[in-house]
């Protein structure tokens, strides 16, 4: 065969295929050789960290001033940089070396004499491997720093270059002392920094977020109260004093870390901690503003201010880990109108607080506030002079409660309380009742109490003297040792709807006897009315006592309900749909006298679907009618100690009374109805 093989391929195809196979084999061989060359010619990945050690100063050395820290660092390749640390803080980075030695010049600014610190160096190579030296310990010499004591009588600046500044003993600041950002001030045990003792003085300490000013104890092992604190005294300059981004710690031996009695000090973005007393204490004109400051570890109240300085308390303060995380209010009388804002922490009131002055001050408590009262302390409004209290918790319940495990004396509204500007709305009042007091007491003034819960009191819930309420609605009174409410008969009608009085030791509203001279309507409540004295309805105004359907009145022994005895009066008791009950405080015949309808009782008087029970204590029946002609229908009159009905000087027909009413269980030896002349 010529030109083509038996399969039809040409000679050209046959030879060219062989050539291609040879070329492919050569390329594979070449690639393998190149790979071997690369593997043999490239070094391995660098994963070895440098070796590094500090060679100066020596472990245990004392440092008295600027010091050169030397570290020797080696690596299998090269060290790129060295990082120097004091304790956990980086103080510098060095990228050049003399051979294998890296040096950093360190000034121990802010390091207090007598303290001990750890030095460490990290060496980093080009691959990012990081090697650490063993730490060495150095001691700061007691000769380090700038020392101060005595009196500063001219303006002075404490620079960061001369830091730390050491206060060796009491220091009187009688001019403006400026402290630069980053300065550390160490104070000797028992020493005080007093500002404005004799002449105007001030402290301007405007630290920064990244350059805090620290005022601390020089003692290397300090505790709360090691030094006394900073005191702005009576002659402190009235402007210019500021503590911003400052740390004040381990003081309080003088009562507080910072005490402001004058000077209108501004405190902002500080840290106050480890006090043996309070954190900040302010009185008089001592404080202009306090905001964004953290208080912790205070053995006393972290913030304590006079009543007139509450407005100086701004936003952003935090109270954590103190003996009591609350703001102490110091003083006895609110003499100017003020608003207490909700700062996120309770107000602690350690003595009785009075709101009263000739200027008629109004104390407004913001929604969400909590006012905590010490044992036997009270909140009194309008004592001797006008005053008002507004506590509207519509957008956040306001709490009035006990500060500790004991009881406080509660809220007292006195006769000169301003009723137009006094109201409790959506409040909680609890833990009161010290010395038998009520949670709320009203003396001859009608205030508004609505949507409020009064609970857990050692005394009564609400006690009124010669007064009722402007409004008393949707309130809950529960958990009281005593009755939920004491009120005179004349003012029962001021008790509104929607109230709950259940769950008290005495399960009834206590009604004090007396004369009803104006129209009154007794509304149905969820507990009975317990009447403790005779109630007489009558006056020149011809008052009507209206009893709502379903009302229950329980009368103490020897008491009665009299209508029209000496002056015109009227009783309207229509028990539709639910009957009205007049009964004794105990289920014994003769417990109370009964209802007496005298000659001045209006002919419009009605008793319909009422129950008159366990009366007759005056031997005149449960229902005594003398000279009047009331309407009596569908009543139950029973369990008398004598007669059920006693008629005298009236045209009422006994048989008609028997037919239209149910008389039963009168005493043996008596008739159901006695008919006199």
Predicted regions span which residues?
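N-terminal compositionally biased, intrinsically disordered segments and leader/signal-like regions
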Residues: 3, 32, 68-69, 75, ...
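Beta-strand/loop edge motif enriched in small/polar residues
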Residues: 43, 142-677
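Low-complexity proline/serine/threonine-rich segments in eukaryotic and viral proteins
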Residues: 16, 27-36
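C-terminal motif of bacterial Sec signal peptides marking the signal peptidase cleavage site
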Residues: 39-41
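Long, low-complexity serine/threonine/glycine- and acidic-rich segments characteristic of extracellular
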Residues: 44-142
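Secretory-pathway ectodomains
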Residues: 2-13, 18-20, 71, 84, ...
């Amino acid at each position: 065969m010529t030109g083509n093989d038996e399969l039809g391929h040409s000679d050209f195809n046959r030879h060219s295929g062989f050539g291609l196979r040879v070329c492919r084999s050569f390329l594979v061989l070449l690639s393998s050789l190149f790979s071997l060359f690369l593997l043999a010619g490239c070094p391995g990945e660098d994963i070895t960290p440098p070796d590094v050690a500090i060679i100066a100063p020596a472990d245990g050395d004392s440092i008295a001033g600027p010091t050169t820290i030397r570290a020797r660092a080696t690596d299998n390749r090269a060290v790129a940089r060295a990082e120097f640390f004091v304790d956990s803080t980086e103080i510098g980075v060095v990228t050049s070396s003399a051979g294998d030695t890296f040096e950093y010049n360190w000034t121990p600014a802010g390091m207090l004499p007598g303290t001990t610190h750890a030095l460490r160096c990290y060496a980093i190579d080009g691959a990012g491997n990081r090697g650490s030296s063993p730490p060495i310990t150095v001691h700061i010499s007691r000769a380090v720093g700038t020392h101060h004591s005595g009196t500063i009588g001219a303006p002075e600046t404490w620079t960061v270059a001369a830091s730390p500044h050491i206060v060796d003993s009491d220091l009187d600041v009688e001019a403006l002392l400026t402290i630069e950002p980053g300065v550390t001030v160490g104070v000797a045990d028992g020493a005080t920094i007093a500002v404005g003792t004799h002449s105007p003085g001030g402290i301007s300490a405007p630290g920064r977020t990244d350059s805090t000013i620290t005022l601390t104890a020089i003692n290397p092992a300090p505790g709360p109260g090691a030094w006394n604190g900073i005191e702005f005294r009576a002659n402190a300059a009235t402007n210019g004093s500021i503590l911003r981004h400052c740390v004040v710690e381990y003081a309080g031996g003088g009562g507080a870390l910072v005490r402001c009695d004058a000077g209108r000090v501004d405190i902002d973005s500080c840290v106050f901690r480890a006090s043996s007393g309070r954190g900040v204490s302010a009185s008089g004109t001592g404080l202009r503003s306090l905001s964004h400051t953290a208080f912790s570890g205070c053995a006393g109240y972290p913030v304590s201010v006079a009543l007139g300085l509450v407005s100086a308390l701004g936003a952003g303060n935090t109270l954590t880990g103190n003996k009591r995380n609350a703001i102490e209010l110091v003083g006895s009388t609110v003499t100017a109108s003020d608003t207490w804002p909700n700062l996120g922490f309770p107000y602690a009131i350690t003595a009785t607080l009075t709101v009263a002055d000739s200027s008629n001050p109004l104390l407004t408590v913001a929604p969400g506030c909590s006012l905590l009262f010490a044992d036997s302390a009270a909140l009194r409004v309008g004592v001797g002079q006008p005053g008002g209290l507004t506590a509207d918790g519509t957008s956040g319940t306001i709490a009035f409660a006990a500060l500790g495990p004991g009881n406080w004396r509660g809220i007292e509204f006195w006769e000169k309380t301003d009723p137009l500007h006094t109201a409790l709305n959506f409040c909680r009042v609890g833990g009161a009742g010290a010395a038998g007091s009520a949670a709320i007491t009203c003396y001859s003034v009608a205030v508004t109490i609505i949507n409020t819960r009064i609970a857990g009191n050692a005394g009564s819930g609400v006690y009124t003297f010669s007064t009722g309420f402007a409004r008393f609605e949707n309130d809950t009174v529960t958990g009281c040792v005593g009755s939920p409410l004491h009120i005179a008969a004349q003012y029962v009608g001021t008790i509104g709807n929607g109230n709950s009085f259940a769950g008290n030791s005495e399960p009834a509203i206590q009604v004090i006897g007396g004369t009803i001279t104006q129209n009154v309507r007794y509304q149905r409540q969820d507990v009975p009315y317990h009447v403790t004295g005779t109630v007489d309805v009558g006056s020149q105004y011809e008052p009507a006592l209206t009893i709502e359907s379903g009302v229950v009145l329980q009368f103490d022994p020897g008491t009665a309900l009299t209508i029209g005895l000496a002056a015109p009066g009227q009783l309207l008791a229509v028990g539709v749909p639910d009957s009205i009950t007049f009964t004794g405080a105990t289920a014994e015949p003769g417990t109370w006298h009964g209802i007496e309808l005298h000659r001045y009782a209006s002919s419009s008087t009605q008793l319909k679907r009422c129950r008159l029970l366990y009366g007759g204590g005056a031997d005149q029946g449960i229902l005594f009618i003398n000279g009047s002609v009331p309407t009596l229908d569908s009543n139950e009159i029973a369990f008398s100690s004598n007669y059920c009905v006693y008629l005298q000087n009236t045209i009422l027909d006994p048989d008609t009374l028997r037919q239209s009413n149910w008389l039963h269980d009168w005493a043996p030896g008596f008739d159901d109805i006695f008919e006199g002349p």
